[in-house]
Amino acid sequence: MEGTVERLIEAGDRETLARALHDRKYADVPGSIKTGWAFYAAKLGKADMLRLLVERCHGMPLEKDAQGKNLLHAAASSGDRETMAFALRVLGMDALAGDLQGITPLDIAAKTGEEALKTLEELCGVRLSDCYRNPVLRGFRPDPSIVRVGEDYYMVNSSFVMVPALPISHSRDLVHWETIGHVFTDPDTARLRGAMGGFGYWAPDISYYKGRFWVVATLRSSTVPARAQMITSAPTPQGPWDAPKFLDVDGIDPSIFTDDDGKRYLVTNIGAQITPLSDAGDLLGEPRMIWYGWNRIKSEGPHLLKKDGWYYLFIAEGGTGFSHVESCARSRSLYGPYESCPFNPILGKRDEEAYIRRSGHGKPVQLPDGRWAFVYLCGRRVEEKTLMGRETAIDPLDWTPDGWPMINRLKGPSCLQKKFLSDAPVKPNEPWVCPRLSPESFSFLETDGSVWVQGGAELSEMDAAHALMHRLREASVTLEATVDLRQMESGGMAGLTGYYDEHSYFLLVLRKTVLGSDVVLRQRVGDGETEETLGRVSGWEAALRVDGHGLTFTASCPDAKETKTFRAEYLTDEGLQGGKRFSGALVGLAAVGAGQAVFRNIREEMRDVQD
C-alpha cells in the first residue's frame, strides 16, 4: 500500500490515488505513514496530491517530522509556488515558524534557490533580508528590562555573581546590541563576595526619570538579609553610577513605575506589590499587594505600564523552567482591582517541542512611531536542555480594539521576525567576566592580544578563582590558545574551561612539573571531581583546544597528540539537581596555583546552526 501511494504521488495520478485512499486497507495504515505521504507530496511540489491527502487525512496539517519541520518546510524545499501557496493560505502555516533548530520555511527556500525564496517571500509578504533572529542577545542574558530615550534603547540584564555586574546594552534598532557599561565593576561595592553560584544580582529594571537613569535589582546573598533591593542612578547609562542603596524590602525582581502625576513606586513580587518611592529612591511606605497573578504559581518579574487610562500589570509566572509564561492584568485604579487578560498567558508555553522555550519575564517598550515591542527571556533547546542559559528575545506587541495586549499575535516566541527599524549594526564587544572578582584584578591584556593571568584558587572556591570567561552564545564552539607556564610554579596549571558554577565545570590544562607539563582534563560535577591525564609534553608551553557541539565536547592538545571526547550535561540549567541553576554556561581561560600564565594565539569561535 505504501509503495503504491508513493508511486501515484510521483506520477501525479489524482484519480487513482483517490480510489486507493478509499481502500479499506487504508484505515489500518498508521498516521505517521499518512503524514509521510503528505510530506513526500509537498517535497515533490505535487500540490494536487498534497491537497487530496490533507482532505482525506484529518489532522495532518498539525503534524511535524522528526526535525520539527511542517508541511510548509517541505513545500519550500520543492520551490513550487502552488504547493507553498496551499500550505500558507489554506493550511494557515507560518513562513517564520522554526523547527527544532530554529530553521524556518524561508530559510529552507533560501537554500533551495533564489527563485524559491523569491516565490515564498512574495506569497507570505515578508523578505528574509527584512527579518531578524531571536534571541537578539545571546548567551545568558535573562530578565531583560528596557527603556527608550529619544531614538535610543537601553537594556539591563541579570548577571548573578559575574563581575562586572549588571550589563547595560544600547541599540538603535532593537536587534543589534552593544554593551556600553556595567552598574558595578567592583565586587566589594556590589557585595558579591561569598555569594553562591546562581545568587548575586537578579532581575534588574532600568528606567529614566528627571534626566537620570535608574537601575534597581535584587541582591540575593548568602547572608542576612537574604534578599535586598539595590537601587542606584546615573546621569548616563555608561555611568558613573551612584553608591548603591540597599532597600529592606522582601521579594525579588523590583521595577520602578512612575505614574502620570510624577509619583514613583517600587514594584516587587510576591505576586505584584507596590511601595511608594521618593525622588531620591527611598521608601515612603509599606508594600501592598495589588494582584497575585493569573495561575498564581511563582509569580515574579512585575512591570507596570500606564496606557489610555489603564494600569497594565505584566507578570511572569510558572517558575524559571519550561512552564515559564507571561501574563497580564489591568485596572482603572493603581491599587486595583485588576482584571486578568482573557488571552492569558500572553506569551509562553504554546509548543513544548519548540526551539525557543521558557519564555516570559519581560517588559514592553513603545517605539517613536507608536508601535510596541516586548523584550523577554527565553531558552533555546540543545538536546532537550538549556546550555546557553536564558537569553533575551523581542517580539511585536499589538493591542486589541478593546485594549488587551498580544505578544507576537499569541503565537509564542518567534525564531524569525520582521525587523522593527532599519538596521543599525554595532561592533560585537563581549566583555570578559569572572565570578565574584574583577577581571582587571588578576589579568592583563597585551597589545599583541596575549593575556597574562595570575594564578588563583580552584574554580570550586568561592572568592579566589581566576578565570576570564565569555558567555557561551551558540551551541557550537571552538576555543583554543597556546598556554605558557614558564612563570608558574611547579604544580600550577592553566588552560581552557567550560564553566557553569563552582559545582559544574571542566578544565583542560597544562600542569607544570619539573620535567615538563602534563595535559590534564578535570571535570567537576556536584561535589565530585574526576581527573584524567591525556598526555605529556616536554617543556612548559603547548597549544590546547576545546571543540563543543551541543553537549558533546572534545579536548585536545596537538603537541601531545591526545584527544578526549566527553559529555558535559552539567553545563546546562538542568545538569544538576538543587541549587539556583538558571544562569548559563561560559567558556574561557583559567589559571590555578602560584605564579602567572600567559595565553597566546587565543581563538574563540561560536557558530549558529544557521551558519
Protein language model annotation of sequence segments:
Residues 2-5, 30-40, 64-70, 98-104:
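Ankyrin-repeat boundary/"N-cap" motif
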Residues 16, 48-49, 82-83, 115-119:
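Conserved ankyrin/ankyrin-like repeat signature
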Residues 19-26, 51-60, 86-94, 122-125:
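Ankyrin repeat domain, specifically the short helix-to-loop turn at the C-terminus of the second helix
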Residues 59, 67-69, 73-79, 93-96, ...:
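A generic tandem-repeat structural signature
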Residues 7-12, 40-46, 74-80, 108-114:
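Ankyrin repeat A-helix N-terminal signature
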Residues 2-7, 110-128:
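Ankyrin-repeat-protein effector appendages
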Residues 127-611:
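Carbohydrate-active catalytic/glycan-binding domains of CAZyme proteins
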